[in-house]
A protein has these predicted regions:
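HIT superfamily nucleotide-processing domains
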Residues: 1-115
């Protein structure tokens, strides 16, 4: 794998994660085709795991080339008639933070579902 998956600290969208390329590369165009294809394949695996676990009606993907220090994509589950449905997601709405135990449980569930 060429990626690392991090549970996003703010969980207004249950299951939100950030998929980060393992090396310090700033933009997708700096990756060779095999690396880029592997990164997107990993993204697909993570997306399928999130759909299986949380059953969102949609997944939004965000890449912030001017903010992120590495190639990174936010994968944001969206739920109909809930927060920010039919709107772009905020980078950090500061609304929902879990306990450490809840983060650990969610991370374990996601990790298991990705395998």
């Amino acid at each position: 794998d060429v990626t690392r998956v991090y549970l996003y600290p703010e969980q207004s969208h249950r299951g939100r994660v950030v998929l980060v390329y393992k090396d310090k590369v700033k933009s997708l165009d700096k990756l060779v085709p095999l690396e880029r294809n592997t990164f997107f394949s990993d993204m697909d695996r993570v997306a399928k795991a999130l759909k299986k676990l949380y059953a969102p009606q949609a997944l939004n993907y965000g890449n912030y080339g001017d903010i992120d220090k590495k190639v990174a994509f936010h994968i944001v589950p969206k739920y109909e008639n809930e927060f920010e449905w039919n709107e772009p997601f905020a980078i950090n709405p500061e609304k929902v933070f879990l306990t450490q135990e809840e983060y650990e449980l969610m991370a374990k569930e996601i990790k298991k579902a990705i395998k």
